[in-house]
């Protein structure tokens, strides 16, 4: 799917039930072009400020996100919009001003039953010091991952048992050896070299083979 500008009313099919009524007044208060776009590996959403050529706020969100990830990403970008309105380009993108604004934007959505309990717990912990992306917070990422459309034969490294083999996107094969506090120590089967993997990386499970190439 390429980029597709969408009506605010189409948001209803992408966000949790009951949240659209909270979102709509924000869009009524600002001139925003909302775009749904294909999956982007390095970014879930994006905010662009008005320019002379395009005198309106622009927000884009990846259309492949589950409804809870979609809403959180949208709120993330709405906070960027408000920071621009108040500070223009005088503050850093994810500095204290954005963190404070994101908390304020998020508060009305907490405790309303819009998120599953596990996601809301992780979200409350995350928003105490929000990072530039939910992908960098293991607790929130794992909670949201549970609501993604299942991908057969794939798991997070954290969810593998020691001894299980897996394949990365690049086709390299590893065996999970040991789970540490924030990472897992894994052996590359072809070379015998050890590597450390973040627990929130999604990998493809493969059958364990007899012997090792290395």
Annotate the PLM regions.
Residues 2-53, 58-59, 64-67, 87-214:
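Metalloprotease/metallohydrolase-associated module, dominated by Zn2+-dependent proteases
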Residues 72-85:
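Active-site recognition of the HExxH zinc-binding catalytic motif
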């Amino acid at each position: 799917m390429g980029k597709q500008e969408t009506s605010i009313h189409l948001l209803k099919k992408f966000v949790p039930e009951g949240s659209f009524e909270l979102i709509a007044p924000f869009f009524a208060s600002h001139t925003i072009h909302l775009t749904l776009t294909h999956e982007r590996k390095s970014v879930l959403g994006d905010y662009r400020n008005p320019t002379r050529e395009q005198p309106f706020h622009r927000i884009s969100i990846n259309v492949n996100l589950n409804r809870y990830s979609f809403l959180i990403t949208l709120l993330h970008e709405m906070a960027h919009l408000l920071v621009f309105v108040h500070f223009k380009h005088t503050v850093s993108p994810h500095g204290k001003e954005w963190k404070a604004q994101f908390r304020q934007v998020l508060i009305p959505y907490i405790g309303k039953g819009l998120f599953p309990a596990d996601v809301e717990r992780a979200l409350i912990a995350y928003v105490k010091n929000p990072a530039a992306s939910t992908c960098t917070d293991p607790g929130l990422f794992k909670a949201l991952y549970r609501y993604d459309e299942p991908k057969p034969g794939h798991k997070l490294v954290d969810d593998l048992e020691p001894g299980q083999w897996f394949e990365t996107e690049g086709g390299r094969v590893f065996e999970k050896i040991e789970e540490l506090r924030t990472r897992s120590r894994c052996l590359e089967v072809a070379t015998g070299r050890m590597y450390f993997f973040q627990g929130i990386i999604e990998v493809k499970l493969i059958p364990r083979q007899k012997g090792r190439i290395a």
